[in-house]
Amino acid sequence: MPPLASCTVAVIGLGYVGLPLAVELAKHQECVRTGEPLRRRVIGFDVNTLRLEELRAGHDRTREISPSELQAATGLELTADPALLAQADVFVVTVPTPIDSAKRPDLTPLEKASATVGRALKQRRSATTPVVIFESTVYPGTTEEVCVPILERESDLRFNKGFACGYSPERINPGDQEHRLT
């Protein structure tokens, strides 16, 4: 993987977790340690085109991000085009995991996102090893038992050989303006 300062990061799912993360990554275009400019690119991917239109107009219906914060995220490219994901070095999956009527997690959004990322991995032309990070709230074992097999099937790559994978859940309280990601 190239250094984080110059890699392309794709955030998949621009809801309560993904949008603040994408904005934060995109607004820091200078290394805090050295002051040198960063060459990092951030792709914000969502399948909801209405959501993307609202964000482009400076409106976040979740109220997690202000219009000025959206405007300051100059390195953020919003898209619903999965083909652009093939340009990423790091994939951060932040899709929702709602529960069904029996209070079981519905992994459908996570499975669909994993398949989308897997197809992007297959289309990549970079020699660097891509990293896929799951931040969706799931039960133990989901990454290894559900997500990784989908990534392998869709990409024709093998875990820890063709791509790396990890899990890092975000702990946020939607609507809490005092305790935010940053």
Language-model features: locations:
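NAD(P)+-binding Rossmann beta1-loop-alpha1 motif at the extreme N-terminus of oxidoreductases
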Residues: 1-57, 77, 83
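A structured beta-alpha segment of the ubiquitous adenosine-cofactor-binding alpha/beta core
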Residues: 65-90, 99-100, 118, 122-125
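Rossmann-like NAD(P)(H) cofactor-binding subdomain of soluble oxidoreductases
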Residues: 99-171
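A general structural motif
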Residues: 6, 39, 88, 127-129, ...
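Solvent-exposed alpha-helices and their adjacent loops that cap or buttress functional pockets
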Residues: 2-4, 70, 157-159, 178-181
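Short mixed-charge
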Residues: 32, 37, 62-74, 154-164
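Redox-cofactor binding/interface segments in oxidoreductases and associated redox assembly factors
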Residues: 91-93, 134
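Dinucleotide-binding Rossmann-like beta1-alpha1 core, especially the glycine-rich loop
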Residues: 93, 164, 171-182
